[in-house]
């Protein structure tokens, strides 16, 4: 039986992070977690990490698509936070962001990982950006690293 498992060390990987500026008080922590995981665990040098800031989560799919199509990166990580408010805006932004990133990922030849928080409250977002529930930015980075190696193994 052949078994393919990814490892998270990818010292030569070139990784782009697309991050939303809206809710940056949360997103800064997601970015910190992602960069820490890439450098410390994945052994990716800071010179091989590109961070692209966009206005909000709605702009992430187009930006990620452009990064994928540039052929400069081995993986792209999307980071952002959408917090439910009193209107239907949350559903539109969260749904379109998720759907758009999923579409880009399925059309891509490289890993596209989802580090976008969709929460009911600011407290839930804070918990997922480095306190009680870990750091979803770091998790998205680890997933990107592992998937780089899984896809390399599959392609031979």
From Swiss-Prot:
The active site is at 89 (proton donor). One of its GO terms (cellular component) is cytosol. One of its GO terms (biological process) is riboflavin biosynthetic process. (2S)-2-hydroxy-3-oxobutyl phosphate binds at residues 86-87, 128. The keyword Kinase does not apply. Its EC number is 2.5.1.78. 5-amino-6-(D-ribitylamino)uracil binds at residues 22, 57-59, 81-83, 114. Keywords: Riboflavin biosynthesis, Transferase. It catalyses: (2S)-2-hydroxy-3-oxobutyl phosphate + 5-amino-6-(D-ribitylamino)uracil = 6,7-dimethyl-8-(1-D-ribityl)lumazine + phosphate + 2 H2O + H(+). Pathway: Cofactor biosynthesis; riboflavin biosynthesis; riboflavin from 2-hydroxy-3-oxobutyl phosphate and 5-amino-6-(D-ribitylamino)uracil: step 1/2. GO terms for molecular function: 6,7-dimethyl-8-ribityllumazine synthase activity. CDD domains: Lumazine_synthase-I. Catalyzes the formation of 6,7-dimethyl-8-ribityllumazine by condensation of 5-amino-6-(D-ribitylamino)uracil with 3,4-dihydroxy-2-butanone 4-phosphate. This is the penultimate step in the biosynthesis of riboflavin. Belongs to the DMRL synthase family. Forms an icosahedral capsid composed of 60 subunits, arranged as a dodecamer of pentamers. This is 6,7-dimethyl-8-ribityllumazine synthase.
């Amino acid at each position: 039986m052949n078994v393919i498992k990814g490892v998270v060390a990818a010292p030569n990987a070139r990784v782009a992070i697309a991050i939303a500026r809206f809710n940056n008080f949360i997103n800064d922590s997601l970015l910190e977690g992602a960069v820490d995981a890439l450098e410390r665990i994945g052994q990716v040098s800071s010179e091989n990490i590109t961070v692209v800031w966009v206005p909000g989560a709605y702009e992430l799919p187009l930006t990620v698509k452009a990064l994928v199509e540039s052929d400069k990166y081995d993986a792209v990580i999307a980071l952002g936070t959408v917090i439910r408010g009193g209107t239907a805006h949350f559903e539109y932004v969260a749904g379109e962001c998720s759907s758009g990133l999923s579409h880009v990922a399925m059309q891509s030849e490289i890993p596209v990982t989802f580090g976008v928080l969709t929460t009911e409250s600011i407290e839930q977002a804070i918990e997922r950006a480095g306190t009680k529930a870990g750091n979803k930015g770091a998790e998205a980075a680890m997933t990107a690293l592992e998937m780089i190696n899984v896809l390399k193994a599959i392609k031979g």
